[in-house]
Structure formats: structure tokens, C-alpha cells
Amino acid sequence: VVARAACAAGTELERAPVIVVPADDLLDREPQDTVPDHYLLYWSDEPRQELAMGCGLLMIYNHSAHPNVEFTDGPEPDTISVVALCAIAAGEELTYDYGVELWFKEAAHPKTVRRKAKATKGKKRKR
């Protein structure tokens, strides 16, 4: 995902609905690593609201240990907002920190961005 236009820190870049997925609805199978597993986010500690699948572009943002966006609670129920952590140039890739132990090797990234503490919502589900 890349920025179509330059934007300032704090800009909401996307607001997307989520589909809440109760943890009990996941199938107990081997191997655990299926395609849908890659697209589940932590959502809530509330029973039957533990996970969510993001709609819109949410599930195709790449990971970076030096992200330029974060996922926050959206203003409407069952939504996530993507918010710029710093000024972003037009054409710059938008990345967020998955917040879990990575299952792939991360490439070096020259840009360092200071980021706010992250809430639990929006972190990739640890598999």
C-alpha cells in the first residue's frame, strides 16, 4: 500500500470495517498455518470477539519495525483507523508493526520512525 498524496502525522489514511471472528469458530487442524490465519488480528478480550479480519486494504499493509502508520480503534463500532505516525510523502509505502514474533526474515529498512505505544487491537494474530 502506498500513499497517493503527501500527508501529515496524525492523518487518518483509511477507516475500514472488520469482521469479528470468535476464537471458538477456528477449526482445530494441522497444520495450523493456513491462508486465513495470516489475516486475523487480535480484537478483544471479550468472549466471542477475540479476533477480527480486516476489510478494505487493512490486510495488505506490509510489516516494518520502523512503521509510518498505526492501527487504532475506529470511531464506529467494529472499525479500525489507519493513522500516519509521521509526515508521509506521496508514493511512500505505508507500513505498520505487526506486533508479534515474525514468521519471516525482515529486510533492512533505512528509515527510523519513533512511534507511539501500541494497543492490543490490530496486532497480527500469533500463530
For the regions a language model picked out, list residue spans one by one:
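Conserved catalytic SET/PR domain of SAM-dependent protein methyltransferases, capturing the structural core
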Residues: V1-R127
